[in-house]
């Protein structure tokens, strides 16, 4: 199975990069992982709604360039569905069983995802009603993908 994580912005913090590298290494026995970083747009401090929408659309266009027609797209969205780790592993397994060999997870920038990206998504997922820095969220997503594969393989995992 192929897993792509398409996210806005680059990871600058060494501790986050180290965590991403660790989970990437752990996941290598379960899937082919591809992490794609698209350029984030600078957001003015007092951006208007119109300016925010323009930024989201620019970032969204960059994201969509990396999504192929046959990808099963899971958008990370505050309004998405919250599920348990076991349900998340079922979602990944159902993709595999239905012939979706590539799952593309999409993480927006500080303003979230454009309507175009949300419309393209096959599934909208929320981890929490809380807001997390998108750089940190990448680590959280990788951990949950790793946990999902361990669940699917019947391997022990921390509950």
Swiss-Prot record:
It is found in: Cytoplasm. Pfam families: SPOUT_MTase. Its EC number is 2.1.1.177. One of its GO terms (cellular component) is cytoplasm. InterPro entries: Alpha/beta_knot_MTases, RlmH-like, tRNA_m1G_MTases_N. Coiled coil: none annotated. Disulfide bonds: none annotated. S-adenosyl-L-methionine binds at residues 76, 108, 127-132. It catalyses: pseudouridine(1915) in 23S rRNA + S-adenosyl-L-methionine = N(3)-methylpseudouridine(1915) in 23S rRNA + S-adenosyl-L-homocysteine + H(+). HAMAP family: 23SrRNA_methyltr_H (MF_00658). Belongs to the RNA methyltransferase RlmH family. Homodimer. Specifically methylates the pseudouridine at position 1915 (m3Psi1915) in 23S rRNA. This is Ribosomal RNA large subunit methyltransferase H. It comes from Clostridium botulinum (strain Loch Maree / Type A3).
């Amino acid at each position: 199975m192929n897993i792509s994580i398409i996210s806005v912005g680059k990871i600058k913090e060494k501790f986050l990069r180290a965590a991403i590298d660790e989970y990437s290494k752990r996941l290598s026995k379960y899937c082919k992982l591809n992490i794609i970083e698209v350029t984030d747009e600078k957001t003015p401090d007092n951006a208007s709604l119109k300016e925010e929408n323009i930024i989201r659309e620019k970032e969204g266009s960059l994201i969509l360039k990396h999504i192929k027609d046959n990808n099963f797209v899971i958008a990370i969205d505050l309004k998405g569905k919250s599920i348990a780790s076991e349900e998340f592993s079922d979602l990944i397994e159902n993709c595999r069983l239905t012939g979706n060999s590539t799952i593309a997870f999409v993480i927006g920038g500080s303003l979230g995802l454009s309507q175009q990206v949300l419309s393209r998504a096959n599934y909208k997922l929320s981890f929490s009603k809380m807001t997390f820095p998108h750089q940190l969220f990448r680590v959280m997503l990788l951990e949950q993908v790793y946990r999902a594969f361990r669940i699917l393989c019947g391997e022990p995992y921390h509950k």
